[in-house]
């Protein structure tokens, strides 16, 4: 150790002190300049689109207002995709090495078809990154305080005032502003396929993942009602491919009592019943809903159904439903806070938006129930709180 220290202290017999200082300066400058030049070059739009996998999204960008507009200000790739702060920039550069790996080594995005198959995954990753830093790259140009709402469209001005008040992240509402939106259904439909593949009806308490017909007796051909998605049943008996189940729910006492709901006064549907299933129900209790002064009865129905499309834990269903919500309602605008509406209010709200989606009946039912079970007047019930509201 002493020899090493002495060697470091003594001037080199071969090089002068001046030469060593000069070499040190050159190395120091190189260590400063080369990374800077490297970052600058690899941040240019020309460099970004030099990979052929980026050509389709480049053409999409050229059709956007960020490429050509009345003011002549152009947002380049780095303006949107590289955070302005040094730590964020370095982190993003390191993450970008994965893009190179996926293109040239893994070959997962090296054709238009492969890229399209992963578009939703790539977009969600970028949205999450922008959400995490509160759209810092957007804010390097756009500033809530600098906006003249009088020059905006009235609806845009209204939305921007709300966003400014809450300091909302730009990406919440402005997805797809520079690139084509992905088909988000590919993500949540794959998730449903995985949920269906993991179906497990071994427990005493089960939850439906699909709309399932129910029957008055085992082996019946004609259904006596339907069990709706994300509904709980108790298993009374197992017989081959059939399950005898017990369904509990509320119905308005003065009505036809064909629809069971999760809570009295809230139209969160559990099941529809008719025929012999309806005739054999038991009334467990009654209560009056103060808001409407109507009497509701808690009923218990016994029925049969075929095995399949049932799980013994509600949480995977809610995780799938959350993907449904974010993948569907974020397409046109920022998805509102679920607790902004009450359970009954979500029916009309979702009906007003459902025409802009490609959801099928099962997906629509699952999404509605998820929203209702996390609404302002039921928040927490979707996570295991069984306390009923009177």
Swiss-Prot record:
GO terms for biological process: aerobic respiration; anaerobic electron transport chain; anaerobic respiration; negative regulation of signal transduction; regulation of pH. Keywords: Cell inner membrane, Cell membrane, Electron transport, Heme, Iron, Membrane, Metal-binding, Transmembrane, Transmembrane helix, Transport. The gene is torC. Part of the anaerobic respiratory chain of trimethylamine-N-oxide reductase TorA. Acts by transferring electrons from the membranous menaquinones to TorA. This transfer probably involves an electron transfer pathway from menaquinones to the N-terminal domain of TorC, then from the N-terminus to the C-terminus, and finally to TorA. TorC apocytochrome negatively autoregulates the torCAD operon probably by inhibiting the TorS kinase activity. One of its GO terms (cellular component) is membrane. SUPFAM superfamilies: Multiheme cytochromes. Heme 4 binds at residues 170, 173-174. Binds 5 heme groups per subunit. Heme 2 binds at residues 77, 80-81. Residues 38-390 are periplasmic. It is found in: Cell inner membrane. One of its GO terms (molecular function) is electron transfer activity. The chain crosses the membrane at residues 17-37. InterPro entries: Cytochrome_c-type_ET (IPR051174), Membr-bd_4haem_cyt_TorC (IPR009154), Multihaem_cyt_sf (IPR036280), NapC/NirT_cyt_c_N (IPR005126), NapC/NirT_cytc_sf (IPR038266). The N-terminal domain interacts with TorA. The immature C-terminal domain can bind to the N-terminal detector region of TorS. Heme 1 binds at residues 48, 51-52. Residues 1-16 are cytoplasmic. Belongs to the TorC/TorY family. It is a single-pass type II membrane protein. Heme 5 binds at residues 329, 332-333. This is Cytochrome c-type protein TorC. Coiled coil: none annotated. It comes from the Bacteria. Heme 3 binds at residues 138, 141-142.
């Amino acid at each position: 150790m002493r020899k090493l220290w002495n060697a470091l202290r003594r001037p080199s017999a071969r090089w002068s002190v001046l030469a060593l200082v000069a070499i040190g300066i050159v190395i120091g400058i190189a260590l400063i300049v080369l990374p800077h030049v490297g970052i600058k070059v690899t941040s240019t739009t020309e460099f970004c689109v030099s990979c052929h996998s980026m050509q389709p999204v480049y053409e999409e960008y050229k059709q956007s207002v960020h490429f050509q507009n009345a003011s002549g200000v152009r947002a380049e790739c780095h303006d949107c995709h590289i955070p302005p702060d040094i730590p964020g920039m370095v982190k993003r550069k390191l993450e970008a090495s994965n893009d190179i790996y996926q293109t040239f080594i893994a070959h997962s995005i090296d054709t238009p078809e492969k890229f399209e198959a992963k578009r939703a995954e790539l977009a969600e990753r970028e949205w999450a990154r922008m959400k995490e830093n509160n759209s810092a790259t957007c804010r390097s140009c756009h500033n809530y305080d600098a906006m003249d709402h009088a020059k905006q469209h009235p609806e845009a001005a209204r939305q921007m005032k709300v966003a400014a008040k809450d300091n909302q992240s730009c990406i919440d509402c402005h997805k797809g502003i520079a690139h084509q939106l992905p088909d988000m259904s590919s993500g949540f439909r794959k998730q449903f396929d995985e949920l269906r593949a993991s179906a497990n009806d071994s427990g005493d308490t089960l939850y439906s993942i699909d709309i399932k017909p129910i029957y008055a007796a085992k082996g019946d051909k004609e259904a006596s009602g339907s069990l709706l998605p994300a509904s709980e049943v108790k298993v009374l008996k197992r017989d081959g491919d059939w399950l005898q189940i017990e369904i509990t729910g509320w119905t308005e006492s003065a009505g036809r009592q064909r629809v069971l709901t999760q809570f009295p006064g809230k139209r969160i549907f559990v099941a529809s019943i008719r025929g012999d299933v309806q005739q054999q129900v038991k009334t467990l209790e009654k209560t009056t809903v103060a808001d409407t002064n109507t009497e509701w009865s808690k009923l218990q129905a016994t029925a049969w159904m075929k095995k399949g499309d049932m799980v013994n834990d509600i949480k995977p269903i809610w995780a799938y439903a959350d993907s449904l919500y974010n993948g569907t309602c974020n397409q046109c605008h920022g998805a509102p806070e679920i607790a902004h509406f009450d359970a009954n209010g979500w029916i009309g709200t979702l009906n007003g938006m459902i025409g802009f989606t490609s959801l099928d009946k099962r997906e629509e039912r699952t999404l509605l129930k998820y929203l209702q079970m996390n609404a302002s007047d039921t928040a927490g019930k979707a996570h295991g709180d069984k306390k009923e509201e009177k």
